[in-house]
């Protein structure tokens, strides 16, 4: 049964990064009781009076909460309500004490004063002409924003985006909404086509309008990118756009063909089919193919025999023939791929290549896609290694796009670039890396092709190997190691599609769970036994799961382990405490922290969270606090590029969609010393037997082969 609740927002417990879900505490206007409310939308302001519509439900972990189907900002009426609203910090020039003085002077008529005769605020001690002007301008801005919010909320647009729209366009907001609404897709990060389309239609845009149709086509291409595709077949794009916009396919085809003819929508022809791109991905695929082909004509540097002998002598080892071959090819080729699983000698080979490069007085630069992968590369090579983003001096623009300062105009100075964990690079990052190489520079890509594909579009490492023109060194011989041999042996079994088994040394163990709750209990027991809450284990151990949702999903595991670590219940699903292990969710170039970086919370106050990362401290305040998440548990995808002494990997039949060989292989190989697999025979069998056969729409390989035409 739907109920209405009115009250004042007292505290935001959780606000999702995309502004689509929040949990907050509400002080009920009638009972004055504090209650929990959940809303699928952006979080309201603390101190804001709101009217909620919804129903009560019992959350399995957090108890009774009011599930809002609608949230409406309302004007404060009672004096206490007004005081909380004014003291919230929304209005510039008014703090808690000033709010009290204003309400003491005007009582329940305070908001009437703000609306109709704001000059009367001069009667309040402490408000002079300058302060009044500040209050007046700030309140007027809030009024305009609130009016816009109410209009957009009626169309299902979240408050967060309404605020962003108002900040971006100011006095021109109405003009943009009425005459050029689709520019908001480009201008407002995170605001999607469907939300903008609702605004446009409400403002009278013709459903058959060609501008609307072309933006719909772009939206469908962008959706393909989210599935890992770099482009999409014209026919499927037109069909899906027709269904999305509820217009005939003929209308879509006419608008689409016109946009393609005028090169507004880039396209490539391959095998008698046309594939459509967004401009940035078109440039990435076509230009990357040209650059790679041009790099194939590199002049050999000479024999690496002396360098190999020097390396073997200094390190008291003998390189395998395949490793020696790789060192020589690195000195001969413009582009080289080195691929192999754990224990096959990739790290040793990188060090040998560095020695050979120095023989020829060549400067070397080491990179990796993630911070943890770069740190591992640095430790194993004895040389500094950076993330690719840091090496290319990436900056985030207001539009949400990334600009790389290192490019054709200001390339990297080094002669040989070595990229580890190269299988993680999508085609866009790969392209920007190629743009940053100076004339004559050599590129060596090191990676494990059997791991998960990139999160972003394309799979350039796989395509380079498939092309057959780039020299590829496959390291297959497993060198015996004192630690982790049980992990390496089982990883090899998985890679070949065979079942994995526990080893006698206990480096690879399997807990066979009878149910999802049994698996959850096993995770918690192992965390207790291994003392996950200790400072040492927090960073050397990791719990992994394929998915965020579910009893054994990352979200639930994180909260449960957090409570285990602290020894008491923790309020809210995103409440941080000193000592918590956290992960940065997106690249922040100003702070110098990157997607996947792990840190420890060392202090928390009312509005700030202080996190220690390796070698630096970062402060999060305001909306920045949504840039981190608990990291006691993480997805296998997020762990790629990282290694830990101990890994607990959960893999269950209920996670069926994720049960694939490369995911199991990637999860298992994150551990150096000990892997604990919590699973069932059926889930393991399904995972090892199911290869990721889903092909991605990408024309990088046909473009390399010269088979595709612009």
Each model region followed by its residue ranges:
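Accessory, non-ATPase domains that flank or precede helicase/AAA+ motor cores in DNA-metabolism machines
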Residues: 1-302, 710
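Conserved helicase motor core of SF1/SF2 NTP-dependent helicases
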Residues: 352, 356, 360-362, 368-380, ...
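Conserved RecA-like ASCE P-loop NTPase motor core of nucleic-acid helicases/translocases
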Residues: 339-376, 446, 509-515, 526, ...
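C-terminal accessory regions
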Residues: 496, 597-710
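The Walker A (P-loop) glycine that initiates the GxxxxGKT/S ATP-binding motif of P-loop NTPases
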Residues: 90, 123, 340, 368, ...
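Pre-Walker A segment
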Residues: 269-341, 348
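Conserved helicase motor core of P-loop NTPases
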Residues: 449-591, 602
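Loop/turn positions that initiate beta-strands
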Residues: 47-49, 579, 596
């Amino acid at each position: 049964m739907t109920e209405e609740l009115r009250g004042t927002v007292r505290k935001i417990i959780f606000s999702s990064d995309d502004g689509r879900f929040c949990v907050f505490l509400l002080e009920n206007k009638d009972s004055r009781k504090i209650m929990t409310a959940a809303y699928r939308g952006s979080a309201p302001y603390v101190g804001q009076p709101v009217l909620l519509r919804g129903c009560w439900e019992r959350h399995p972990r957090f108890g009774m909460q009011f599930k809002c189907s609608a949230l409406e900002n309302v004007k404060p009426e009672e004096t206490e309500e007004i005081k909380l609203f004014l003291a919230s910090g929304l209005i510039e020039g008014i703090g808690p004490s000033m709010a009290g003085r204003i309400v003491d002077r005007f009582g329940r008529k305070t908001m009437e004063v703000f609306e109709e005769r704001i000059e009367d605020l001069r009667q309040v001690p402490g408000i002079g002409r300058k302060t009044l002007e500040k209050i007046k301008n700030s309140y007027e801005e809030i009024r305009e924003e609130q009016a816009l919010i109410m209009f957009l909320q009626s169309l299902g647009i979240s408050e967060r985006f309404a605020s962003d729209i108002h900040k971006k366009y100011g006095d021109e907001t109405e003009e943009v909404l009425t005459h050029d609404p689709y520019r908001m897709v480009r201008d407002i990060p995170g605001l999607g086509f469907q939300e903008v389309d609702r605004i446009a239609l409400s403002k009278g845009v013709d459903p058959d309008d060609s501008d609307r149709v072309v933006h719909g086509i772009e939206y469908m291409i962008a959706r393909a990118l989210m599935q890992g595709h770099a482009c999409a077949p014209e026919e499927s794009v037109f069909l899906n756009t027709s269904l999305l916009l509820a217009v005939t396919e003929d209308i879509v085809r006419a608008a689409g063909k016109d946009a393609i003819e005028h090169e507004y929508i880039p396209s490539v022809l391959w095998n008698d089919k046309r594939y459509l791109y967004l401009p940035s991905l078109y440039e990435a695929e076509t230009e990357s193919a040209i650059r790679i082909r041009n790099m194939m004509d590199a002049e050999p540097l000479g024999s690496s025999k002396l360098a190999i002998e020097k390396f073997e002598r200094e390190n008291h080892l003998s390189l395998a023939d395949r490793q020696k071959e790789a060192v020589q090819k690195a000195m001969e080729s413009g582009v080289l791929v080195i691929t192999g699983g754990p224990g096959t000698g990739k790290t040793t080979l990188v060090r040998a290549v560095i020695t050979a490069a120095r023989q020829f007085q060549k400067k070397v630069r080491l990179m990796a896609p993630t911070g943890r992968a770069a740190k591992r590369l640095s430790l194993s090579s004895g040389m500094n290694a950076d993330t690719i983003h840091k090496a290319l001096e990436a900056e985030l623009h207001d539009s949400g796009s990334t600009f790389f300062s290192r490019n054709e105009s200001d390339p990297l100075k080094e002669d040989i670039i070595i990229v580890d964990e190269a299988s993680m690079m999508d085609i866009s990052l790969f392209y920007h890396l190629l743009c940053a190489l100076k004339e004559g520079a050599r590129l060596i890509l090191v990676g494990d092709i059997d791991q998960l594909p990139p999160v972003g579009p394309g799979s350039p490492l796989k395509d380079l190997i498939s092309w057959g023109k780039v020299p590829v060194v496959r390291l297959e011989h497993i060198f015996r190691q004192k630690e982790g041999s049980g992990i390496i042996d089982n990883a090899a079994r998985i890679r070949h599609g065979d079942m994995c088994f526990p080893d006698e040394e206990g480096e690879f163990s399997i807990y066979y769970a009878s149910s999802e709750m049994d698996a959850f209990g096993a995770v918690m027991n192992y965390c207790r036994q291994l003392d996950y809450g200790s400072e040492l284990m927090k960073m050397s151990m990791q719990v992994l799961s394929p998915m965020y949702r579910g009893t054994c999903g990352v979200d639930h595991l994180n909260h449960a382990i957090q409570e285990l670590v602290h020894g008491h219940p923790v309020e809210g699903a995103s409440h941080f405490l000193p000592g918590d292990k956290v992960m940065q969710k997106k690249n922040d170039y100003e702070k110098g922290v990157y997607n996947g970086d792990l840190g420890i919370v060392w202090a928390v106050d009312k509005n700030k969270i202080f996190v220690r990362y390796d070698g630096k401290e970062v402060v999060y305040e305001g909306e920045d606090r949504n840039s981190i998440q608990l990291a006691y548990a993480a997805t296998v995808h997020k762990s790629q590029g990282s290694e830990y002494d101990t890994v607990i990997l959960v893999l269950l039949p209920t996670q069926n969609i994720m049960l694939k060989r490369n995911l199991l292989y990637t999860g298992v190989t994150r551990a150096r010393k000990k892997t604990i697999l919590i699973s069932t025979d059926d889930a393991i069998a399904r995972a090892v037997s199911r290869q990721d056969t889903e092909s991605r729409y990408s024309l990088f390989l046909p473009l390399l082969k010269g088979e595709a035409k612009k």
